[in-house]
Design a protein with these regions (language model features):
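Short acidic/polar inter-strand loop motif in beta-rich domains
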Residues: 176-187
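Short coil-to-beta strand junction motifs in C2/discoidin
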Residues: 85-117
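Single conserved hydrophobic/aromatic residue that forms the stacking wall/gate
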Residues: 208-218
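Exposed aromatic-hydrophobic patches
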Residues: 151-161
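Catalytic cores of secreted or luminal carbohydrate-active enzymes
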Residues: 2-57, 63-89
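Generic long, charged, amphipathic alpha-helical segments
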Residues: 131-148, 152
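Divalent metal-coordination and catalytic microenvironments
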Residues: 29-32, 119, 172
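Short, aromatic- and glycine-rich surface loops/edge beta-strands on solvent-exposed regions
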Residues: 166-176
Length: 218
């Protein structure tokens, strides 16, 4: 429907598992070894490193020393145009092409680069009315990454943790190189001299509007 022109291609939830059984997946969720992306299938690991043990993302650990973290992120696969050969009949292939506009999940062997990794640090309140402006550091640290098919791996420490004597929560964002999105010109505005949208020509949808070569079908 027309409203779909305003939506993104959808986010993804990922979970680290020891096996792909139902129980294995639920165990990963219970252990909070999870992360989300805005859609690309990015691989991400975020570990707390100690002298005796490694704790994965989602862990809660009591420490007296400054924590040391390790992050690794690998970009999603670049997509090849069209659809792979699913071995379907001619009729099924025609129907598939009509449904998805001839574009499927069709990964190549080349991955997108991770351009940087951002670290966010949150310090929980000590009392209900404590101002939160200084407690949420977004972003706290930024690490630029070199282009690599092996992804990006960094290690860092919070040198203020022990001195501050307060609990802290850390999470990371892996930023992938830009990629094309679907239906980015859905309203197709006509602009005045000041750059204001004065008229729209919404993308073709079902039987309500006429299609044009610029239309993108999902």
């Amino acid at each position: 429907e027309r409203q779909s022109s305003f939506f993104t291609t959808g986010g993804l939830a990922a979970v680290h598992v020891e096996d792909r059984s139902k129980q294995g997946i639920w165990n990963g969720f219970k252990n909070k070894e999870t992360y989300a992306t805005s859609g690309p299938q990015i691989l991400l690991w975020f570990d707390l490193i100690t002298t005796s043990e490694t704790f994965p993302m989602g862990s809660k650990v009591n420490l007296e020393k400054n924590p040391v973290f390790e992050v690794k992120a690998v970009g999603s696969f670049k997509q090849k145009p069209g659809c792979p050969d699913f071995g379907l009949s001619a009729n099924d292939n025609a129907r598939l092409k009509k449904i998805c506009g001839g574009e499927c999940f069709n990964p190549s062997n080349e991955r997108r680069n991770i351009t940087r990794i951002e670290v966010i640090k949150i310090t929980p309140q000590n009392y209900n009315d404590e101002p939160v402006d200084e407690l949420i550091e977004d972003t706290w640290k930024v690490f630029d990454c070199k282009p690599s098919q092996d992804g990006c791996k960094i290690r860092f420490s919070d040198r203020e943790f022990q001195r501050n004597g307060r609990d802290s929560v850390y999470y990371v964002r892996a930023i992938e190189e830009p990629s094309l999105r679907v239906n980015g010109d859905n309203l197709r505005c006509e602009y005045d001299d000041q750059g204001n949208c004065i008229k729209v020509n919404i993308c073709h949808c079902l039987l309500y509007t006429s299609p044009s070569p610029r239309d993108v079908h999902l």
